[in-house]
Amino acid sequence: MLFTIFKRYVSAYPVGLILVLVFTLAQVMGSLLLPALNARVIDDGIAQGNLPLVWQLGGVMLIVAVAQLATAIIEVAAGSYVSMAVARDIRRDFFAKVMTFGHQEAQTFGVSSLITRSTNDVRQVQQFLTMAMTMMVMAPVMAFGGLIMAFAQDLILSWVIVVTVVILAIVMALAVRGMVPSFQVMQQRIDAMGSVLSQQLAGTRVIRAFGKEDVEKKRFAQANRDMTRASLMVGRYFVALYPTVFALINVGTVAVVWFGARGVEAGTSQVGTVVAFIQYLMLIMMGVLMFAFMSMMVPRAEVAAGRLVAVMDTRVHLDRDSGRVDELPQPGTFEFRDVTFTYPGAEEPVVQDVSFSAEVGSTVAVIGATGSGKTTLAKLLVRLLEPTSGTVLLGGVPIQDISRQTLGTQFGYVAQNPYVFGATVAQNLRLGNPGASDEELWEVLRTAQAEDFVRELDGQLDFEINQGGKNLSGGQRQRIAIAMALARRAPVLVFDDSFSALDTATDLRLRQALSNVSATSLIITQRISSARTADIIVVLDHGRVVGQGTHDDLMATSPVYREIAESQATQEAL
């Protein structure tokens, strides 16, 4: 999957890649040249008393060091730009893909997992790219170049380096082999803890209402312990690895000094050669360490990249960009024509052979017991779901043939559990109509029966609503959501059980105000009081239409409708 990320995103920045590769190579070549120059300074300059040569070689070493600094700055800048640009592009495409998800795809991954993927996984890939672009060139050139230069300095001493490198490579291979599954487990534990925390934050009120704080504390503590154990599992490898690696480096250095000193004493080696050898040993070890570090990062980055690609390559069942129709011949009308819908994996359809229609300016109410398929019809109309069979028409056109841009202007939709954004009242209301004036906002608030409480808020239209409307009551949140839908000035309004948190008096005033709105309305409800004034009432029972007509007609002809009315036992319903 890392190759997929590289192919899609990194390859889009060839100039940055070339700069990183060229200047990293130049930096490593400078590192390989300095020990050889240092050896000449010691053996041919200081040992021979040749001060002009010392000054000459010292000047060359200074130039090389300055050049290394310059190349390192350019390399780091180019590498950082490429990695950050790639991370930006991944986040952009990830978000764009998630925005195309329907109900099925969103449930497949889960909200907490999608958040973790868009943050932690992108960060893992970015960190890997930052390191990899440098280390992929630096590690092999430094290791093999160091070996070649060491062999060129003293063939006899080179066996010390070879033995040390072989032992170090074996240690690293064993460590990486153990770390790969540990990183995978740790990523799973991160997801699990994020899921637990997300559920607890979202369900704080329910947890408190049921007095389950201690239970949830234990559940989070268990997830935290699992995460800690997974982290400690990885940490143990690092704890054992680093002392072992540095011990090997120190032993190799001591061996070079020991055998080098004996060579100097015997006249087969020179002091400068031994010093250069130690420096080359360090460079070789650095190269091996970089390679090992990369090997440890690859599994974690591979897991992260795979999780990102899994989201971005998901085939969306509902293609919202398939439509091409921009003009509707009968705007403000809709029709369900023999519509059946079955959720993936379900044995029975949730709605079956549903047919009804709405004319311009009319109000259609859909009523039925819990689980009868009412919300599914609302989602089918606004195309959050696609019918398994049958056709949903909007403005006389099959809804799948309407372009996404046009479809987005046709509805004011209030979901069953309305969501209010963390922004001011005005910003929420202008979400679907950015050009709406303050007077227009007060007008829709008045219609939604929200004007009185908004005027009492600190700042009124500028009052800051918490994310999800947590600082509003359920009824206030519903009325703000209704006002948001009205502010769109859309030809069709869809209210999915949107009056459930309102008292009977407010519900009545709201319905009276909505009757003056120039729009076709679909009202999903369980209340007879919310449905009785509709032009057409559609009665659903187990996903099928079992009655259709006005309130009086259904009271006379529909046993299901009459049973609902009688069970609510209100004077208005009867």
Show the residue positions of the predicted features.
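Membrane-integrated ABC transporters
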Residues: 1-34, 46-60, 75-79, 83, ...
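Juxtamembrane helix-loop junctions of ABC transporter transmembrane domains
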Residues: 2, 22-23, 27-43, 64-111, ...
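ABC-type nucleotide-binding domain
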Residues: 327-574
